[in-house]
Amino acid sequence: MIVLGIDPGSRRCGYGVVAREGARLTVVESGVLVPGDLPMAQRLGRILDGLDALIARARPLEASVESVFSGASPRSALVLGQARGVALAAAARAGLPVFEYAPSEVKLAFTGNGRAGKDQMLRTARMLLGAAPGLSDEADALAIAVCHLARRAFAVPAAGAGRAAAARAAAARLRPSRRDHRGTP
């Protein structure tokens, strides 16, 4: 099973492609897309192009994206929402099921600490995956992919089922990553 993790951002978009075979995790590819100092629309276009190329190269079966952090300023949340939209569109265009996880859930699954800092995320990526991420965006993206793999509640369908059928079966059997306990219908 190969999963793409995306840590969206308009200035730096981290990505991590992680493969799982049994209990073994392997980094297929990871890095950070840095579109440069351009107007917003052009930065988002470059991120979309980079994610499209990455998906074509790595051929993940599913994508996982970090959800918006609610404590951000309204302007930061808007910009992050636009970058998330690009990440979601790239995955949807490739036909990948997309799963979203809260930052604290990702940190808990990756480090065992839901409030882990950037240094702890980088250290865990080195220790757990043997990766050497240069930026926290890359480590976060790897963590998002690992979190998704940890949350999967089933085995991958047998070989020969085909990529599309395997992806549909995977999406149908996943547990929700969060539940709404507010009681509203």
UniProtKB/Swiss-Prot annotation:
Record carries keyword Nucleotidyltransferase: no
Active site, per annotation: 7, 66, 137
Cofactor note: Binds 2 Mg(2+) ion per subunit.
Stored Pfam families: RuvC (PF02075)
Amino-acid positions noted as binding Mg(2+) 2 in the UniProt annotation, renumbered to this chain: 66
Annotated catalysed reactions: Endonucleolytic cleavage at a junction such as a reciprocal single-stranded crossover between two homologous DNA duplexes (Holliday junction)
UniProt subcellular location: Cytoplasm
Keywords carried by this UniProt record: Cytoplasm, DNA damage, DNA recombination, DNA repair, DNA-binding, Endonuclease, Hydrolase, Magnesium, Metal-binding, Nuclease
Disulfide bonds: none
Needed cofactors: Mg(2+)
One GO MF term: magnesium ion binding
Principal location listed in the UniProt entry: cytoplasm
EC annotation from Swiss-Prot or TrEMBL: 3.1.21.10
GO biological process: DNA recombination; DNA repair
Domain of life: Bacteria
UniProt-annotated binding residues for Mg(2+) 1: 7, 137
Listed GO CC annotations: cytoplasm; Holliday junction resolvase complex
InterPro entries in the record: RNaseH-like_sf (IPR012337), RNaseH_sf (IPR036397), X-over_junc_endoDNase_RuvC (IPR002176)
PANTHER family: CROSSOVER JUNCTION ENDODEOXYRIBONUCLEASE RUVC (PTHR30194:SF3)
Task performed by this protein: The RuvA-RuvB-RuvC complex processes Holliday junction (HJ) DNA during genetic recombination and DNA repair. Endonuclease that resolves HJ intermediates. Cleaves cruciform DNA by making single-stranded nicks across the HJ at symmetrical positions within the homologous arms, yielding a 5'-phosphate and a 3'-hydroxyl group; requires a central core of homology in the junction. The consensus cleavage sequence is 5'-(A/T)TT(C/G)-3'. Cleavage occurs on the 3'-side of the TT dinucleotide at the point of strand exchange.
Self-association state and partner proteins as the record states: Homodimer which binds Holliday junction (HJ) DNA. The HJ becomes 2-fold symmetrical on binding to RuvC with unstacked arms; it has a different conformation from HJ DNA in complex with RuvA. In the full resolvosome a probable DNA-RuvA(4)-RuvB(12)-RuvC(2) complex forms which resolves the HJ.
Similarity remark: Belongs to the RuvC family.
Protein name as catalogued: Crossover junction endodeoxyribonuclease RuvC
Source organism (scientific name): Anaeromyxobacter dehalogenans (strain 2CP-1 / ATCC BAA-258)
